[in-house]
Amino acid sequence: MSWFIQTCRSSLGKKYIMALTGFMLGAFLLVHTIGNSTIFWGRDAFNAYAHHLHALGIFVPIFEIGLYSLFFLHVITGLLLWQQNKTARGGKYAVETSAGGSTFASKTMPYTGIAIFVFILIHLVNFHFPEKTAEKTISDFVTEVLGNPLFTLIYGAGITLLFIHISHGFWSLLQTFGISHPRYDY
């Protein structure tokens, strides 16, 4: 077991953890987006989808705990890698130049990550924590929240930042697992 812990503490091990947790969070996000797209089929379809999810009973909180754990592990590992990279550099460089491999997405990963965390909190406050009743369905919450121009702007910005974060994260995942390698380029 010590080799496993030693690997997880290494820089490469942390990158594996980031890639795996990011992949699993991305898979959840894909399923969540597909499910939420039922709103385009009408209020009844969306409310039926939400009712189906809540009918899963005890599996819902178990799944949520797993999801929160993945998210927590992803965030903590990301912060550790960010700090480790900062420490390895030994401070700011005298001349700010791009090494050729950095992109806007790669340079802003910690910041987009923090913004996404805030966005997720806003999302949970708006849609997860409010009590759903027979008088007020989930589609009513969506209409109410996204009917507010401020929240529409917040959601648009949050999704944009999420896309930027995931675009670099997906590329990093391919790099970490050796899938994006000159040997495989055509």
Positions of the model-derived regions?
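Membrane-embedded alpha-helical bundles that constitute the cytochrome b-like, heme-associated redox core
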Residues: 1-186
